Structures are given as structure tokens and as C-alpha cells.
Amino acid sequence: MEKNEPTQSKYDAALAKYNTQLDDAEIAAQAARIIAEKVPANNTPEVKKFLFNCIDLTTLNSTDSDESVMKFTQKVNKFDEEFPDLKNVAAICVYPNFAEVVKDTLEVEDVKIACVSAGFPSSQTFIEVKVAETAMALMEGADEIDIVISVGKFLAGDYEGMCEEIQELKATCKEHHMKVILETGALKTASNIKKASILSILSLIHI
């Protein structure tokens, strides 16, 4: 009797639809070429103003306190007075325990409140803790949530574990935006970065 062939997981099947075998040197050369060709045309005041308006102004220090975060937020409140020709930043990003401080201090309507969550930055904690932290950040006033993928799970080939965490956290966020950070420095290779990107995107549409 022949042994059954191992069944391919839906995650491996999804990755098989894309070319994920990338050469790091070739990718680096392509990136350098794009930078050389495109930077001069985009090194303009208009582009810089646009990019500034995309910034999440961030304070993630172990020394952060209610007072320091309040002062940090006040700088954003005063930005329009000091720089009337520039659009403000997109968001203020803080740890979840400071979401309420920002909410109570922020006076600018079009600046969002972003919170890192889910065991940021290592993502090494229980999924129950990740969900609870995310839910509490939203309850305290966060508009957006930033998470880091479970890099350890990804590198170990546990794509299911990584993707299910993303799905559960997005379900917690509901209509709120959730940013998935890949931690590319830990992924090392272009192939890993592409695989993690694909899996993260597909997780949000429930592969």
C-alpha cells in the first residue's frame, strides 16, 4: 500500500502562486537603480510636503509618561500656527496606555491616534494578551493599531499560526485600520520579506 503524499497547506498553496525565489543581490541592484532614477524627480517641495503629511509622529520610549505624552501632543496642536503652509502629520503613535492621554489632549481633528499593540515590538506573548491589549487601546481612544507579525512563527514555518493571529487581531479592530509591520531586518532575505508580505495581505482577506 502506497503512503499518502503529504497534503500541501493552504498557505504554501497561496505562496506557490507567486515567484518567491528572489536573489538578494539582484533586488539590491534594482532598488539602487530605482533610487538613482527616481529620486531627482521626486526631490521636490511638493513631494516632501506630501510625505510629511503621511508621517505617524511617534514616541515609544521607556521614559514616556502622561506629562511627556501630553507635551508631545501639544506640539501637534500648535503645528498649524507655526507652519501654516504645511499639512499636519497623519497620526500620533504611542503605547496603548497613553491613548487616552492623546485623546484628551489632541485638538486637531484630522490627526489620528495610532497605538502599537499585540506585544509590540517582539510580538512574543499570548494571543489572548495581544487581543486584550488591542481591544483596550481601541477602547481608550486609538483610531489605528500597529502590530508586528510573529516573526518567530514565520521563520519556523508556522504560517498558520502567524496568519491566524493577524486575522484574530483584525477581527478585534473591526472597522479600525490595522497596520501589519513585517520586521524586515529580522526576516533577512528578499524571499522571506515577499512571503511575509503575501501572507499578511492574504490574512486580511482570510485565505
Where are these regions (language model features)?
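Charged, compositionally biased N-terminal leader segments and the immediate start
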Residues: 2-55
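Conserved, mostly hydrophobic/aromatic
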Residues: 56, 102, 137, 180
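Structural preference for beta-strand elements that scaffold enzyme active sites
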Residues: 52, 91, 110-114, 144-148, ...
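Active-site mouth loops of central-metabolism enzymes
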Residues: 55-66, 115-129, 152-157, 181-192
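Alpha-helix-loop-beta-strand connector modules within alpha/beta enzyme cores
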Residues: 96, 100-118, 159-179
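Glycine-rich, proline-tolerant flexible connector loops at the mouths of alpha/beta enzymes
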Residues: 59-65, 81-101, 118, 122, ...
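Conserved anion-binding
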Residues: 134, 144-203
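Conserved small/polar residues in nucleotide/adenosyl-binding loops
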Residues: 206-207
